[in-house]
Amino acid sequence: VTIVAARPRRRVAAWLPRLGAVVAAVLLWWVLTDLVAAPQSLLREFGPQHVPGAIAGLLDRGVLLPDIAVSMWRLLVGLLIAVTVGVPLGLLLGLHAATESAVAPVVQFLRMISPLSWAPIAVALFGIGHQPVIFLVAAASVWPIVLNTTAGVRSIDPGLLLVARSFGATRREQVSAVILPAIRGPVQTGFRVGLGIAWVVLVPAEMLGVRSGLGYQILNARDQLAYDQVMAVIVVIGLIGFALDLLARVVLDRP
């Protein structure tokens, strides 16, 4: 009974520092926007005390939930494209050292370019709408998946492949029975990193002339001088990003 009762106390004790950090951050936010800011400063409109009412207003207008849904759809499609391209490419580079050596300069060059730098090209190719946003999300998240998949393949014990070959396993069977299970961890890590980068890139990508999504809603609120709504959307973006990372950890860390 004592051991069982001690577990909830340990969990509470583990969460107390995190809760304290959140409270301290919100308090600092309030001090900067309410006490430090000048009486007529627009900075006061960004205070935490305005956020709940602004979120309620966005919900009453029926714009917040549809914008969240659109942003999530663009994120998921972009990530699906990144995984579809990144995992096979990572397998190819990991299995063929000569290919990896040949394309390494190109890969390093491309991955060092900010995904948002491709925005003018994306708009020129796809026009205004979902497509350029999805393209930028995919371009942002594909490289962590490629690099982690390649590293995962390179780290496989050669003895495992040798055993598979000794049993007469074909190349396809080696990939499905040995390589893919062995690189699960690195691929999951690449996906989590790619997810975080994709979410960061998504919001500015939605400011490229589209008329939906959380990025668009920030611009729309700014144009209406509704700075409390700007801050509210920023808070929503942060909360969703935190929830996505937590969900990815829970789902991907399952044995």
How does the language model describe each region?
Residues 1-23, 27, 246-255:
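Transmembrane alpha-helical segments of polytopic membrane transport and secretion proteins
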Residues 7, 35-81:
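Periplasmic/extracellular loop-to-transmembrane helix junction in inner-membrane transport proteins
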Residues 52, 61, 65, 69, ...:
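Alpha-helical membrane-protein architecture signal
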Residues 77-107:
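Transmembrane-helix boundary motif in ABC transporter permease subunits
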Residues 108-144, 151-152:
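Generic hydrophobic transmembrane alpha-helix motif, especially the helices
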Residues 124-125, 153, 200-237:
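Glycine-rich helix-loop "coupling/hinge" segments at transmembrane-helix boundaries
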Residues 135, 139, 171-205, 231-232, ...:
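Transmembrane alpha-helices
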Residues 145-193, 218:
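Short cytoplasmic-facing helical segments at TM-TM junctions of multi-pass membrane proteins
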